[in-house]
Amino acid sequence: MAKPASIKIRLNSTADTGFFYVTKKNARTKTDKMVLKKYDPIVRKHVEFKEGKIK
């Protein structure tokens, strides 16, 4: 069976609130770490979220 192209990743908030999003990315085309600006409801602001592994 072939290895799937997309993998699940965890986007951790850089505001150190412990909030995270779970999303997918294509591991073959996006080899670098993903950094997105998304909404963190704990601090009620848009902050950067950096990619981390799902445990």
From Swiss-Prot:
Pfam families: Ribosomal_L33 (PF00471). Gene3D superfamilies: Ribosomal protein L33 (2.20.28.120). One of its GO terms (molecular function) is structural constituent of ribosome. It comes from the Bacteria. One of its GO terms (cellular component) is cytosolic large ribosomal subunit. Disulfide bonds: none annotated. Keywords: Ribonucleoprotein, Ribosomal protein. GO terms for biological process: translation. The keyword Nucleus does not apply. PANTHER family: 54S RIBOSOMAL PROTEIN L39, MITOCHONDRIAL, LARGE RIBOSOMAL SUBUNIT PROTEIN BL33M. Belongs to the bacterial ribosomal protein bL33 family. This is Large ribosomal subunit protein bL33. The gene is rpmG.
